[in-house]
Amino acid sequence: MILHILRRAEWDDARPRGEYRPPSLDAEGFIHCSTIGQVVVTANIFFSGATDLLLLQIDERKLLAELKYEVPATIGDERPRTPFPHIHGALNLDAVVAVAEFPCEVDGSFKLPPSIRDLPSD
């Protein structure tokens, strides 16, 4: 299971089309995803304080596009050593097995929602 963070409006736009194509797909050639062990760090670096987020739970076996685990150049000020899952193409929505609310805490930080905490970790 891999996870993708997105804004509610992006999800609402994708649903009628049956696929999700964020700007990163055109700009970088892939859709950024995270494992359960990576998603909170990702959210805290890139989405701190955002109040309109959702977490897509994606079954990678159902993806039509190629999935690659790649080490990013940087994440914020950090140079990670762990590869992140990247979807190299549009996300077919039938690969999304669940959508969870992903609210930030009062201080703007994130923690795993209960529905995600119960998933097997990587």
Locations of regions flagged by a protein language model:
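Conserved, structured core segments of small domains
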Residues: M1-D122
